[in-house]
Amino acid sequence: ILPTATQYARNAIFSGLTPLDMEKKFPQYWKNDPDEGGKNLYEGEFLTEQLKRLGLNIKQEYYKITNFTSGKKLADNFKSLKNNDLTTIVYNFVDMLSHAKTEMDVVKELASNDKAYRSLTASWFKNSPLLDMIQQAQQLGFKLIITTDHGTINCKNPSKVIGDKNTSLNLRYKTGRSLTYEDKDVYAVKDPKKIGLPALNMSSSFIFAKNDLFLAYVNNYNHYVSYYRNTYQHGGI
């Protein structure tokens, strides 16, 4: 699904719907790019609605882990989940790490390239409650499905883009009116509904950065390029 960003991709996994259908059927849960507030606050509700739609009356629980303490607590009580028909766990660490590489100098040093980034992630995983939970799931005979909502890419080259003040902020995709961009650098969608995306207004379009490009505004272009070059981003192709 495009964009390869959490608010679109992970909500789609839990709802079993395209973003366009989520907006139509569950406006109380769906938020578009400019809307204020968290964009992934209703994953549990989306999952419950999908199970209802599929006619699955099962015992299920949903957990979102955003720090070590909550992960450790769930791991310590993992055996209590054995009576569930379905247990869903969202583990946010890897996504948080990619954001930290942009914002924190110490993480930039530790994950200076793809090899170092993978090594840092592997080191975390080996010492995390997540590995403990996976091992316990095996011991308890659970059927275990591991997936992700999107990947990430080390962005090395900028591509200029111009948009109005309401254009979305993501560096690998943009949605808005009157977007100006380099055709060769993006996959452009003039009619978002054709790929299952909601349109903010009649003239809204989407563009998705290709390869290792990131989209940089002409205003403050040099600042954008120096700050975001060699950072891990997602949302594009």
Feature map (PLM): residue ranges:
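Feature captures the catalytic ectodomains and active-site-proximal regions of enzymes
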Residues: 1-237
